[in-house]
Amino acid sequence: KKTSRLFTLVLIVLAMNVMMAIISDPVVEAVGCEECPMHCKGKMAKPTCYDGVCNCNV
């Protein structure tokens, strides 16, 4: 019985990791103004900030 509980825990952790990976995808990610230049670096971008949301303007 103990193994199934451990298995469930592992599944939950994996699911959380997948969710975090999806959420932290750059397309979805809302980057603050101060991180905007770093976030857009190397993308031939002109970073602008609108309503606290970073936009790379690639």
Curated annotation (Swiss-Prot):
Pfam families: Toxin_6
Cellular-component GO terms for this entry: extracellular region
Record's keyword annotation contains Oxidoreductase: no
Gene Ontology molecular functions: ion channel inhibitor activity; potassium channel regulator activity; toxin activity
Propeptide segments, given as residue ranges: 22-30
Disulfide bonds: 33-49, 36-54, 40-56
Keywords: Disulfide bond, Ion channel impairing toxin, Neurotoxin, Potassium channel impairing toxin, Secreted, Signal, Toxin
Record localization: Secreted
Major site of localization recorded for this protein: secreted
Database matches in InterPro entries: Scorpion_toxin-like_sf, Toxin_alpha-KTx_8/9
Tissue/organ expression: Expressed by the venom gland.
Signal sequence, start to end: 1-21
Transmembrane segments: none
Domain free text: Has the structural arrangement of an alpha-helix connected to a beta-sheet by disulfide bonds (CSalpha/beta).
Family: Belongs to the short scorpion toxin superfamily. Potassium channel inhibitor family. Alpha-KTx 09 subfamily.
Chain's role: Potassium channel inhibitor.
Protein name in UniProt: Potassium channel toxin alpha-KTx 9.9
Originating species: Buthus israelis
